[in-house]
Amino acid sequence: MMIQKPNKRYDRLSTASKKRLVIESDSVLNELQKESAGTIPGMDYFYGLARSYSRGELAKQDKKKYIATSCVQVPIELIYAAGAVPVRTCSGSHSMSQAGAEFLPAKSCSLVSATFGTIYTDSIHVPSKPVAIINPTTCDQKKKLSEIPSGMDIPYYTLELPPTKDSEEAQIYWYSSVKKFSRDLEGITGKRITRSRLKAAILKVARAQQAFRQLHQIRKEHPTIRGTDAILVANTFFYDDIDSWTQHVDSLNHELAQGLHKDPGISGNNAPRILLTGSPSIFPNFKLPVMIEAMGGHIVADEFCSSNRLLYDTVAVDEWNMYDMIPALADRYLKACTCPCFTPNQDRDRKLLSYIKDFRVDGLVYQTFSGCQLYELESSRIGSLMEQENIPMLYIETDYSPDDRGQLSTRIEAFIESLSARK
C-alpha cells in the first residue's frame, strides 16, 4: 500500500519508528559499554557517535551536499571528488525494518526493509537531505526499491554492475558504468571532478583504509578488542566525518597496540576463535555477534560488506591522471568484491580460507537473513568447503526480530562448547 507523505499516518509511522530506533540503539550500546566497563577509552568516541547518530544529534546544518549510498559497491572517492559527502543508508534497525515492511513483500530481507524504512522516514541523519541515492545493481531486492511508489522525494541513481566479474566483457561494462557515474555525479553536484580533486579523494579514503587495515592486523594477535566493537567501529564509517573517523581509529589502534588496556568482556586466549560471514551485522542489529562473545567465543574477523569488506581493499594507482585513476577505482570495486551477486564467486572461497589461516580460526558462523536468497544459495558451497578444511560451521537463518534469541542462544552455546572441546 502506498503511504503518501506528508500526512497523519506517515507522521505517526515516522515518529514511532525513530523513537524505537533510539531505544534499540541505546539498549545495544548500554550492553556493549557495560561489558567493556570503560577499559578501552578509545571506544568511547564510537559508542558516542553511534548513539548520537541514532538520535539525530549529528544533523546540524551545513552547506555540504550529501549523497546516500545503499551498498559497498559505490565508489565513494568519486562522490568526494564531486564535492559531496557520501552517507550509507543500510540499517540494522528492527523498527526501521517494520516501517519498510509497510511497502515490501512479507518475505523481504530485514536489511532491505530497514534500509527502505530509513530512507522513507527521513532517518538518514545528516545535516541536509541527500540530493541522490546511489543504488548499485547487486542485491535483487535493493535494486527494485526505486520503483516502489511511496511518495519519496530523493531521486535514485542506478549504478549498473555486471553479473560476473571475471570476463573481459564484464570488466569493460563496469568501467563504462563507473565513467558514466563520474560524469553524472558532476551534474548532480554541479562540481567538476578534476584530476587534483580525485587524487585528493583517493588519498583521503586510503588513509581511512590504512587505519582500518591496521586494526584488522591487530586483531590477528591475542584478543585485544571484541569483534562486536570492531564491527561497530567500521559501521560508524557510514556517516562519520572521514577525517575524524580516521584520526580516532588511529588513536584506538595505538591504544590497542600498546596493550595498555584489556576489555573484561573478552574471553581468555584459549577462547574459540570465530570468523563471521554471510548477511552483514549492521548496528543496532548486533544480536548474533553479541551472543557469540557472551557465550565465550571471540570474533577475530568477519567477511561482512558492512565492516571488513567496506575498507580493507585499497585503490592501486600507477599514474595520477584521470586515464589511470578511474580504471583503478573500477578495479578496486569490482575485482576485490566477494559479494554473492557475482557468479562464479570462487574469490569468496579463497578469501575465507585466507582468513581462517591468518586468524587461526576455530569455527565459522554463517549468518543469513530470511529472504536473502544470494547468501542462502551460497551457504551449501561454503559448508562443503568448510567440511573439506575440517572447520566446523554453524549456519543461522535469522532476521532483525528479537523473537528467536532463545533458540539462537541454545545453538550458539552448543557450537562454542563443541569448539572448546576440540582445542
Report the location of each language-model feature.
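A charged, amphipathic alpha-helical module
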Residues: 2-65, 179, 183-312, 341
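Generic N-terminal leader/targeting and pre-domain segments
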Residues: 16-28, 33-121, 125
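Short hydrophobic segments within beta-strands
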Residues: 70, 275-277, 367
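Redox- and metal-dependent alpha/beta enzyme cores, enriched for Fe-S-associated oxidoreductases
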Residues: 72-73, 78-92, 99-100, 279-344, ...
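Acidic/His-rich segments in extracytoplasmic proteins that coordinate ligands and/or metal ions
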Residues: 117-184
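A short, acidic, amphipathic alpha-helical segment used as a generic capping/interface helix at domain edges
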Residues: 119, 343-360, 377-378
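Proline-aspartate-enriched helix->loop->beta-strand connector
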Residues: 130, 356, 360-366
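C-terminal regions of proteins
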Residues: 383, 387, 393-423
